[in-house]
Amino acid sequence: MSVIQDLQSRGLIAQTTDIEALDALLNEQKIALYCGFDPTADSLHIGHLLPVLALRRFQQAGHTPIALVGGATGMIGDPSFKAAERSLNSAETVAGWVGSIRSQLTPFLSFEGGNAAIMANNADWFGSMNCLDFLRDIGKHFSVNAMLNKESVKQRIDRDGAGISFTEFAYSLLQGYDFAELNKRHGAVLEIGGSDQWGNITAGIDLTRRLNQKQVFGLTLPLVTKSDGTKFGKTEGGAVWLNAKKTSPYQFYQFWLKVADADVYKFLKYFTFLSIEEIGVVEAKDKASGSKPEAQRILAEEMTRLIHGEEALAAAQRISESLFAEDQSRLTESDFEQLALDGLPAFEVSDGINAVEALVKTGLAASNKEARGFVNAKAVLLNGKPAEANNPNHAAERPDDAYLLIGEYKRFGKYTILRRGKRNHALLVWK
């Protein structure tokens, strides 16, 4: 199966230019292709995964991927289908983000061997280009009429009170020139990107033909949608980042575990490297079993292993199992740090707090009275152990201090998992 056929079977092609010619070229020879990543934050998020993984799929098929980091275009920001103008970031901020994104792209691609991946930065060619060169060598090849007819531009112009600045309007010229420059420097003949990039990609194809007299191609990947209509890649806490310091491997694992049954088989095709046949077997087994599908577990394992590695996957599984067990002794200090980052609602507490106060502080009880009821019913666990009366000499005016949170409830001298019932958790972080 060719790489184009594989992408088609996974539903990963939204639009292409001359797909028959592209497929024939890919079957005849190995090519160089690229995808651009503008640094708009200090980390990539799961919305970037489809193009990143597409580069990897092409490399596995023997082609040379180029990861282009937008050190120059990131200073402006792509306006495509954005409701309002982006805020401009300082050169220092963008430069820092470029370094972060370069390091995050590295694990997905191989930079060794005959088709070693290439890392490029468009600041290398735009940094020395002056305004006159830009207008004379690039601007003259673009029709303002055609640019105004782009859907992404029309939406901004037609939206009340929005409009578009010349800076953002000219963005497609910069991205278009990227293609021409990478074609000249590295022989790139294919640009891939999200479906919102179609206008910018076709602009680059036309400019490359004009400047270099070369036939090149474009391919876009679909917009990832969820069956319930909500935005993919967002949680109540915000974006799901690829940086483990922004989204913990545990939370990342949980995100994929919670994928809806209606989406999970599509996402296995989109995001994993399991074959279509293997995914079909998983789906058939799930349908035949009549019980809880295995697909979400497989998806969560595949994605966490791919992004964070085997050790992080083991930690995510260990945390998941321990939260609902009475024995939490397997949790490491690093596991607790993940929970403090984003795994559980975390609350700072000081010595002298009792179980009733902790329940109310964390929102696991609405009142002291309700909290006492939970404690008396043995429904409260501290690091997996039932909250017990341990302070017979408490002051008479503070009866709840009978259930003082003492040292034995602290793991690594710093953490206590407070659990009420089977599924309600909070993390106490001791000052």
Curated annotation (Swiss-Prot):
It holds the Pfam family SYY_C-terminal. It comes from the Bacteria. Its EC number is 6.1.1.1. One of its GO terms (cellular component) is cytosol. L-tyrosine binds at Y34, Y171, Q175. A motif ('HIGH' region) lies at residues 39-48. ATP binds at K234. GO terms for biological process: tyrosyl-tRNA aminoacylation. Homodimer. This is Tyrosine--tRNA ligase. The gene is tyrS.
